[in-house]
Amino acid sequence: MQKQAELYRGKAKTVYSTENPDLLVLEFRNDTSAGDGARIEQFDCKGMVNNKFNYFIMNKLAEAGIPTQMERLLSDTECLVKKLDMVPVECVVRNRAAGSLVKRLGIEEGIELNPPLFDLFLKNDAMHDPMVNESYCETFGWVSKENLARMKELTYKANDVLKKLFDDAGLILVDFKLEFGLYKGEVVLGDEFSPDGSRLWDKETLEKMDKDRFRQSLGGLIEAYEAVARRLGVQLD
């Protein structure tokens, strides 16, 4: 399956058309961004690590009954995916307090959230991805009530699967975001799951093993990503 025209270039991925109108090529680049793209740097091997990491996670979620857009790996940095009609709202699950939640509520980083929090954010870099709720989604027609309920159900199911997966690997799944789209009328998980869009801490040391290493200038970004992948059993070679 050959990629054709570039359809969209995001902060860290590029989407291409193929000869099949129902399939796309998703290319993971070495770019890493923070501050809604205000700061961008390149890290060797990052595209490869995130591509293979995402493929591994999407397969685990598919095995658990969560429909995903993943078809197959094409190369170290590319995968073939179903073309989705993407919902312009991202779903976030928080198992522990971190990031914007700590700033917004003035609570201590790391406290356990039981039950986990579920947040919705409008995907809009210019507006810094504002937080919204179900009422906004319905009023502005971003997603139907039924499809949003399905997105929420699948997000919580993914959380159950991934919390155990990471716990077994000695990691805490602090929080993560998921994006969904429609494929022939069905809600399907799209975009990616990687340390770019999740927070992962070492269970023993609470060391941050995700993109916060870049956001907070801690260093060792790729080393952390590769360490997480190895713990999970992701084949990087």
Swiss-Prot record:
Pathway terms, separated by semicolons: Purine metabolism; IMP biosynthesis via de novo pathway; 5-amino-1-(5-phospho-D-ribosyl)imidazole-4-carboxamide from 5-amino-1-(5-phospho-D-ribosyl)imidazole-4-carboxylate: step 1/2
GO molecular-function term, one example from the UniProt record: ATP binding
Taxonomy, superkingdom: Bacteria
PANTHER family reported in the protein's UniProt record: MULTIFUNCTIONAL PROTEIN ADE2 (PTHR43599), SI:DKEY-6E2.2 (PTHR43599:SF3)
Gene Ontology annotations of biological process type: 'de novo' IMP biosynthetic process; cobalamin biosynthetic process
Swiss-Prot/TrEMBL catalytic activity: 5-amino-1-(5-phospho-D-ribosyl)imidazole-4-carboxylate + L-aspartate + ATP = (2S)-2-[5-amino-1-(5-phospho-beta-D-ribosyl)imidazole-4-carboxamido]succinate + ADP + phosphate + 2 H(+)
Protein name: Phosphoribosylaminoimidazole-succinocarboxamide synthase
Coiled-coil region(s): none
Homology family: Belongs to the SAICAR synthetase family.
Enzyme Commission no: 6.3.2.6
Membrane spanning residue stretches: none
GO cellular component, one term: cytosol
NCBIfam families: purC
CDD domains reported for this sequence: SAICAR_synt_PurC
Keywords for this protein: ATP-binding, Ligase, Nucleotide-binding, Purine biosynthesis
HAMAP family in UniProt: SAICAR_synth
